[in-house]
Amino acid sequence: MKKLLLATIIFLLAFPCSAEPEIIAHNSAATKKIAITFDDGPHPTHTEEILDILKQYNVKATFFILGVNAAQYPSIVKRTFDEGHELGNHTYNHVFVNRVSDEALREEIRKTDDIITEITGRAPIVFRPPGGAYNDGKVAVIASTGHKCILWSWWQDTRDWSCPPVDKVVSTVMDNLHDGDIVLFHDFNSGKTPTAAALRIIIPRLIEKGYEFVSVSELIAAG
């Protein structure tokens, strides 16, 4: 019995179990910190309006960028970076990562990294899968490309892409508020988006409550 136990210990030391790839959606240790995030941009008008609001309140955010849109609007990507916001990878063509091959996913990530790096001089280190769709295998692929896989706090999905009333977006954020939340917005919307109007209400209220706005990477490192 002792020999079996010793052999088991030796085996585990020689072949340690690898940790599951991490998916980040919240950091409860980030006291009085919040990360607001925007998916699918840049958009030629919506992103600029959002950037103006963030600049007005000296708020930093994280933008998960589609490569195809970055290629079309590089000046907006550059402005976003220059104003101190974090840029994340959101694939090139908004593909659902659980529906493509590992090779195709790596190519989507690589192409988007390349164009963001070309524009800003810095490659993204965070990645958000479109639609929040993933599986363990694809999270491992994402990790192998050097990116952290970021979702959002499930209670902080504003669903602004569906163009709800402004007060609905505001209540989603304010009524479900926790330290260390990652809030999901979209800066690319073909409809009558409520996002900018909601931000003009949400940001001052969060400031009044003493919240600090940080990038996703800063939120992860907090606490």
Predicted regions: what they are:
Residues L4-L13:
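Sec-dependent N-terminal signal peptides
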Residues F15-A19:
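Sec/Tat signal peptide C-region and signal peptidase I cleavage site
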Residues A35, N89-T91, L151-W155, I182-D187:
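Short beta-strands and strand-loop turn motifs
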Residues V95-V100, T158-D160, F185:
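A short acidic, helix-capping loop that chelates divalent metal ions and anchors anionic groups
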Residues L51-K60, F64, E86, D102-D136, ...:
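CE4/NodB-like, metal-dependent polysaccharide N-deacetylase domain
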Residues I125, A133, V139-N176, G210-A222:
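His/Asp/Glu-enriched short active-site or ligand-binding loop at hydrolase and phosphoryl-transfer sites
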Residues P21-S28, Y57, N69-A71, T193-G223:
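C-terminal domain-boundary segment and adjacent tail
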Residues E20-V100, A104, E108-I115, A221:
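Active-site beta->alpha N-cap acidic-glycine motif
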